[in-house]
């Protein structure tokens, strides 16, 4: 059987049907499904980064399931249905691409993005009572991403360095403040945490100035570290040893060897 999107919507509705539906699905609500939504989103990202196209197909389906499930919850509460979600996003795509569906012109991607932002700004006029340039930056965003967005918003009104040098200086300053905290006779953990936070925030600003997405950069660094450490583990096992029994100096040598092989 070949399922359509309407068939799929009905499948999810049946899962939520009090008469014969699934007990687990019936117990779920908006809040309980947040972790599922987050997990499925990151699994899509992982499939893309691994260039695992067959798995990407599956993970996109799982992500679609989340969208339809949340829409079903909203339909039950008489807020909106999946068709409304689809209608809204289709209208938005048409509205924000006047250079495709209208008479506006966009010669390159910069102009196209400018058209998008112009339409987005028009939509917001009179729609909400914003009191700050920082309004509507979702607090649920990953912290690195949210930091970059906050900084970008401030940059739009001139609260930003134009040169890269003071950005580097700020990172050094925050690093020194971390060092000062841990050099105290009595270390206050909350103070250390605060200074580490400031250091991370300054580092995100450096990444932004260098046109790097901090979340992507850290994710790739995680993958690189994982790949290299797995190689170290394998090298240790080939020597008939266990990693936890190998001195750090030997592990460092193996690590350096792995790095050389990669480079």
UniProtKB/Swiss-Prot annotation:
This is Nucleoside triphosphate pyrophosphohydrolase. It comes from Haemophilus influenzae (strain ATCC 51907 / DSM 11121 / KW20 / Rd). Its EC number is 3.6.1.8. Keywords: ATP-binding, Hydrolase, Magnesium, Metal-binding, Nucleotide-binding. It holds the Pfam family MazG. Involved in the regulation of bacterial cell survival under conditions of nutritional stress. Regulates the MazE-MazF toxin-antitoxin (TA) system that mediates programmed cell death (PCD). This is achieved by lowering the cellular concentration of (p)ppGpp produced by RelA under amino acid starvation, thus protecting the cell from the toxicity of MazF. Reduction of (p)ppGpp can be achieved by direct degradation of (p)ppGpp or by degradation of NTPs, which are substrates for (p)ppGpp synthesis by RelA. It comes from the Bacteria. ATP 2 binds at residues 224-228, 255. The lineage of its organism: Bacteria, Pseudomonadati, Pseudomonadota, Gammaproteobacteria, Pasteurellales. Mg(2+) binds at residues 174, 177, 195, 198. SUPFAM superfamilies: all-alpha NTP pyrophosphatases (SSF101386). Homodimer.
